[in-house]
Design a protein with these regions (language model features):
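N-terminal Rossmann-like FAD-binding beta1-loop-alpha1 element of flavoenzymes
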Residues: 17-44
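Extreme N-terminal leader/targeting segments of oxidoreductases
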Residues: 1-19, 37-38, 562-566
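FAD cofactor-binding and catalytic pocket of flavoenzymes
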Residues: 64, 253-256, 265, 269-446, ...
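Redox-cofactor-proximal catalytic regions of oxidoreductases
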Residues: 62-138, 421-437, 442
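A glycine-rich dinucleotide-binding beta-alpha-beta segment and adjacent secondary-structure elements
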Residues: 188-201, 396-435, 443-539, 546
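Residue-level detector of alpha-helix initiation sites
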Residues: 25-26, 232, 536
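Glycine-rich loop(s) and the adjacent beta-strand/alpha-helix scaffold that form part
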Residues: 37, 50, 71-74, 196, ...
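Conserved redox-cofactor binding core of oxidoreductases
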Residues: 73, 104-107, 111-200, 204-205, ...
Length: 566
């Protein structure tokens, strides 16, 4: 089949299928293609086009949000085939076993599924993401050093945890051929879902209503519907749809739109290692298949539970690029490249803005000192040979690479001093939420008011984690952390924000009173509407969301085969 672009349609129409999947991001594409592979007749509905279209992207805008805590939605998400995978970096990290534990110190942290259930889908998720094998431990790296620095063995603190990196895989380009050549799958673009209709108290959705910017209206009839529009857009669609008992679809328990989570991330300390600088594993490594991986600092589950620590990870990072006091020609060259008119070619907006000093919530960097151009040029002139070699090497591996691209770069520090970047759990909080606004978009859909909140517990968890990391470094005799701020709590709080990882607002639960969807991602009380999104996650963990989104989409597709092929 070919792509059916409905964006210019002005007439009404009806489409019938066994399964309608709403949203062609990673969750929607995986669910649709897997279901089609099971012989199910699938329609995949995408609000955007195959390429980027600004007028459609504007439909993602929120009505109200705190710009000091939340990134603007048009920057945080992408409304097109491929979804936000068209602008992501490619980091692939699964949740940890501790994330699925019902932890007494984490409010409402009970999942209706287990880690082992989800781990069974990790190999297939890796295949879809093209990030190699489902091996997330450095012990499997060939001929690799046993630890980040000599003498830093795993204990309560571990450094053998790995993150994997995809191509990065743009689902819109990687899987477009399959989407357009599978006989029992139709991809419809330029048409935006407006509401799901559940007649009376039947307990099942009858149809989906959708509109085009040109004024056309389309009604989709199916046996089952999968909402895969991204975290907040999936929540918005449920809120805009009437439930079988009145109110909002999935809103009977009062949890819909609540528990909105992101992650806590930033830099408040430097590593100062006392081991030989040339033996520090500061950069990416390659696994047996040539896939880029990177080591992370973490804690064992037992240590986290004993010390009531939120889940968190950390890793060696680069100094902030805009501040030329780093005196590194390579860093200055990258900064100037990102600031140039070609900057948008080299990096997505969120990453580029953050790395060039813009204070963008939900990113680890931003708001640093910005040095004059002449100081960056001085760094480059002072190190012409090493800078030139870097440009040639990284340019080949990143810009010119046709398949697997280098995810990024890290520069060696001869003094063995490196920033420590952290990425930690945002604790569940029912007061952190989104609501429908009175303001509507061009299609008449209510927009969202976003109220993302953090608490002192989020800040305290980050600070305590650093204290424990510092203790471990000192006890191992390999170095220490040097803090960059006198008031660590204020420094952590200043960087708190989100918008890129949208977690929790349609949370899953075993009992209808405790959430929005069940263990199979079906909306409680409406057995044929499912949600495939990070919004169903009960906790945020230390991992970014994409890997687990794909794992849950695979699990959902297997469940749908049983439902629609029984």
């Amino acid at each position: 089949m070919t792509v059916h672009d409905l964006g210019t349609d002005t007439v009404d129409g009806t489409v019938d299928a066994e399964l309608v999947v709403i949203g062609a991001g990673p969750a929607g594409i995986v669910t649709a293609l897997e279901a089609a592979g099971h012989g199910i007749d699938v329609v995949l509905v995408e609000s955007g086009e195959v390429g980027y279209e600004p007028s459609l992207q504007d439909l993602s805008a929120a009505a109200a949000w705190d710009p000091t805590r939340h990134a603007p939605m048009p920057i945080a998400v992408r409304r097109q085939v491929g979804g936000t995978s068209t602008i992501w970096g490619g980091r692939c990290v699964p949740y940890d076993p501790v994330d699925f534990e019902d932890r007494p110190f984490v409010e409402s942290s009970s999942w209706p599924v287990t880690y082992d259930e989800m781990a069974a889908y990790f190999p297939r998720a890796c295949d879809w993401l093209v990030c190699g094998r489902a091996m997330f431990d450095a012990s499997g790296l060939p001929d690799a050093p046993p630890s980040i620095v000599p003498g830093l063995d795993d204990g309560d603190v571990t450094t053998s945890s790995l993150e994997r990196w995809s191509l990065p895989t743009d689902f819109g380009t990687t899987y477009l051929h399959q989407l357009t050549h599978v006989a029992n799958l139709r991809l419809l673009t330029g048409v935006t879902a407006t509401r799901i209709v559940v007649p009376g108290e039947h307990g099942a959705a009858d149809h989906l209503e959708a509109r085009t910017l040109a004024g056309g209206r389309v009604t989709f009839h199916a046996s089952a519907f999968v909402v895969a529009c991204g975290g907040l857009e999936s929540t918005r669609l449920l809120m805009s749809s009437p439930g079988p008992h009145g109110g909002q679809l999935g809103g009977e328990s009062g949890h819909l739109g609540r528990w909105y989570m992101a992650h806590a991330e930033g830099v408040i300390a430097n590593f100062r290692f006392t081991t030989p600088a040339e033996r520090t594993v500061f950069d990416y490594e390659l696994d047996v298949d040539g896939v880029y991986v990177r080591r992370r600092f973490a804690f064992t589950e037992e240590f986290q539970l004993r010390h009531e620590l939120p889940n968190i990870a950390g890793w060696i990072a680069n100094p902030e690029l805009p501040d030329a006091s780093h005196r590194d020609g390579k860093l200055s060259f990258v900064y100037l490249a990102l600031e140039s008119p070609l900057g948008p070619v080299f990096a997505p907006d969120a990453q580029r803005l953050s790395l060039t000093g813009v204070d963008l919530p939900g990113t680890p960097y931003g708001g640093s000192a910005v040095s004059p151009l002449r100081e960056h040029l001085r760094n480059i002139v002072r190190q012409p040979v090493s800078t030139g070699r870097f440009v040639a090497d990284f340019g080949t591996r990143r810009v010119l690479a046709r398949n697997r691209k280098a995810p990024g770069f890290f520069v060696h520090n001869g003094h063995n001093v490196y920033p420590m970047q952290y990425h930690g759990e945002h604790l569940p909080n029912p007061a952190s939420q989104v609501r429908l606004s009175r303001q509507v978009d061009r299609l008449g859909r209510p927009m969202l008011d976003i109220d993302l909140r953090f608490t002192d517990a989020d800040v305290d968890g980050v600070v305590r984690a650093h204290r424990h990391w510092d203790d471990h470094l000192r006890a191992s005799g390999v170095g220490r952390l040097e803090y960059l701020y006198d008031d660590l709590h204020e420094a952590v709080d200043r960087r708190l924000g989100g918008g890129f990882h949208q977690v929790g607002t349609t949370r899953m639960s075993a009992m209808p009173a405790d959430g929005v969807v069940d263990a199979n991602l079906a909306v409680h009380g409406v057995g044929n509407v499912f949600v495939a999104s990070s919004s169903t996650f009960v906790t945020s963990g230390q991992a970014n969301s994409t890997f687990m989104i794909v794992a849950f989409a695979l699990r959902l597709a297997d469940h749908l085969r049983g439902v629609l092929r029984h």
